[in-house]
């Protein structure tokens, strides 16, 4: 029943996606549905990158970006708390996603995932009514576009080889 109600809200956003595991019991409204979609995307990214780290060790950029994904999920949860929305507090995808066969394939998958994430926010942001939600989702999109996507593209250009140094991009944390 909760999935059906949430699909109505998500349908209003014309997302065309399936039911997420981070679903509120009541229809969350446009902003809430967008936050649920964002949280689900952050959870999936974290679980994917955790699988890559488990398989390949502390491979960059995954070791850096997984921490960013956790911060992003926390930001989405903070907004959902402010709006009084229910959500799955822990990541339901951890341990359920398999890492690609090679680090290069994982980096290529990261590029695709970040491009899809940017497109998700391109669809969501014009529908947002709450200024704080818009700012939060805009920052998450910025991190995907300006930090995560370039990091995965560099990984692909190196043939999946890990980079040197501590990371953090050119300007620090995201």
Label for each model-derived stretch:
Residues 1-8:
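Bacterial N-terminal signal peptides that target proteins for export
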């Amino acid at each position: 029943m909760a999935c059906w109600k949430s699909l109505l809200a998500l349908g209003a956003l014309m997302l065309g996606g399936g039911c997420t595991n981070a679903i509120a019991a009541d229809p969350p409204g446009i902003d809430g549905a967008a936050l649920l979609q964002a949280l689900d995307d952050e959870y999936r990214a974290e679980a994917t990158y955790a699988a890559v780290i488990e398989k390949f060790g502390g491979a960059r950029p995954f070791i850096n970006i997984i921490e960013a994904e956790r911060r992003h999920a926390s930001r989405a949860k903070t907004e959902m708390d402010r709006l009084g929305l229910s959500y799955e507090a822990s990541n339901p995808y951890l341990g359920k996603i398999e890492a690609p066969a090679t680090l290069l394939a994982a980096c290529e998958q990261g590029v695709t995932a970040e491009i899809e994430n940017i497109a998700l926010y391109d669809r969501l942001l014009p529908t947002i009514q709450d200024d704080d939600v818009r700012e939060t989702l805009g920052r998450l999109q910025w991190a995907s576009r300006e930090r995560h996507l370039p990091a995965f593209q560099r990984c692909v250009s190196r043939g999946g080889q890990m980079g040197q140094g501590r990371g953090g991009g050119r300007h620090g944390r995201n």
